[in-house]
């Protein structure tokens, strides 16, 4: 039996998740040489995506949401890239690299029903596989589908993106530049400002920890903004509402500033009346909605793959290595301590 390092969910956090209290790495025995379920596979998990939505799954089973809660005592789950090492499936063969939602652990034994949720990675441009967890994965599809479906960009407009250096924000900004928009990004430190402007081509960026957000928007967009792509919620959303032009669009992708707060601490946006006076469209979404990810998936994969290959779109992935770093990597992602898409490398791509 192999001692399989796994990221275990222990308790619904109060505030920020606490390593070894709310979640932690434990070894669980697994027989990777034993019988395989009919139609199933055994996977070696190579990479896992660390995303804000996982914080929302760290909750009690009595709390409803769009995604199911993690089960206390079981491994947490995420989008993984894995290599098939043994197979009893007609769909997947040993050596195939696949992606899907699976447990965060070194090896996984999947039943036939779970295998149906995994897809073989097609990689004609031979891109680094971790990119399939970023711009070519769920965050990329989130950015692409919502930018076009809800944002409805028009050349010459102004877009403001919060959490602009993150997995979703960095792609939205680059898509907006391709469409001829004036692109503004807010981030949490000066290094990230330099990254989005000099590295990604944003027209301007600002550090929200150094400037009052509303004053910064007045400075960089004195005539207002047409699209706000919201990744943080709270006071930033309130400030963006003041800056919106008539008939502007607000794409609500996430509210990471609110995820670790108690109900009494949540920020109450005070100027929602401006949605009426300025005829603003404000819309949230889930990437699996039929008019979002499924509608755009083929187009997204085709276009973004090509743009990464030809160098016109620049992905930024931050990779931490080793299951022992899983808890800290997750906290770093939630607190925005690193630049780019957060990925944990669980194992080497080769070998058993």
From Swiss-Prot:
Pfam families: ADH_N_2, ADH_zinc_N. Its EC number is 1.-.-.-. Pathway: Mycotoxin biosynthesis. InterPro entries: ADH-like_C, ADH_N_2, GroES-like_sf, MDR_fam, NAD(P)-bd_dom_sf, PKS_ER. NADP(+) binds at residues 166-169, 192, 208, 231, 285-287. Keywords: NADP, Oxidoreductase. It comes from the Eukaryota. Disruption phenotype: Significantly reduces the production of T-toxin and decreases the virulence to maize. GO terms for molecular function: oxidoreductase activity, acting on the CH-CH group of donors, NAD or NADP as acceptor. It is an enzyme of class 1 (oxidoreductase). The keyword Signal does not apply. NADP-dependent oxidoreductase; part of the Tox1B locus, one of the 2 loci that mediate the biosynthesis of T-toxin, a family of linear polyketides 37 to 45 carbons in length, of which the major component is 41 carbons, and which leads to high virulence to maize. One of the PKSs (PKS1 or PKS2) could synthesize a precursor, used subsequently by the other PKS as starter unit, to add additional carbons. Belongs to the NADP-dependent oxidoreductase L4BD family. This is NADP-dependent oxidoreductase RED1.
């Amino acid at each position: 039996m192999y001692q399989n390092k796994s990221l275990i969910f222990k308790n619904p956090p109060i505030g920020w998740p606490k390593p070894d209290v709310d979640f932690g790495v434990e070894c669980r025995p697994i027989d990777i040489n034993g019988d395989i379920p009919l139609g199933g596979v055994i996977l070696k998990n190579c990479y896992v995506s660390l995303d804000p939505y996982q914080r929302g799954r760290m909750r009690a089973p009595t709390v409803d949401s769009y995604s199911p809660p993690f089960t206390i005592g079981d491994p947490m789950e995420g989008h993984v890239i894995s290599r098939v090492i043994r197979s009893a499936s007609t769909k997947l063969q040993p050596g195939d690299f696949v992606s899907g939602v699976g447990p965060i652990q070194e090896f996984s034994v999947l039943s036939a029903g779970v295998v149906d949720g995994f897809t073989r990675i097609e990689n004609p441009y031979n891109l680094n596989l971790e990119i399939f967890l970023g711009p070519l994965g769920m965050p990329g599809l989130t950015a692409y589908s919502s930018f076009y479906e809800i944002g409805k960009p028009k050349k010459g407009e102004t877009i403001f993106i919060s959490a602009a250096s993150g997995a979703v924000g960095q792609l939205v900004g680059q898509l907006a530049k391709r469409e001829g928009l004036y692109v503004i990004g807010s981030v949490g430190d000066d290094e990230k400002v330099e990254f989005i402007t000099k590295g990604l081509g944003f027209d301007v960026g600002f550090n929200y920890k150094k400037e009052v957000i509303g004053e910064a928007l007045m400075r960089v967009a004195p005539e207002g903004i047409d699209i706000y792509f919201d990744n943080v919620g709270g006071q930033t959303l309130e400030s963006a509402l003041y800056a919106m032009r008539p008939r502007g669009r607000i794409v609500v992708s996430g509210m990471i500033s609110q995820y670790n707060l108690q109900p009494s601490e949540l920020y109450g946006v005070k100027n929602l009346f401006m949605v009426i006076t300025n005829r603003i469209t404000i819309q949230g979404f889930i990437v699996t909605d039929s008019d979002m990810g499924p509608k755009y998936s083929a187009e997204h994969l085709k276009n973004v793959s090509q743009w990464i290959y030809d160098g016109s779109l620049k992905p930024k992935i931050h990779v931490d290595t080793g299951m022992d770093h899983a808890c800290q990597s997750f906290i770093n992602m939630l607190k925005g301590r690193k630049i780019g898409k957060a990925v944990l490398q669980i194992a080497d791509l080769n070998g058993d």
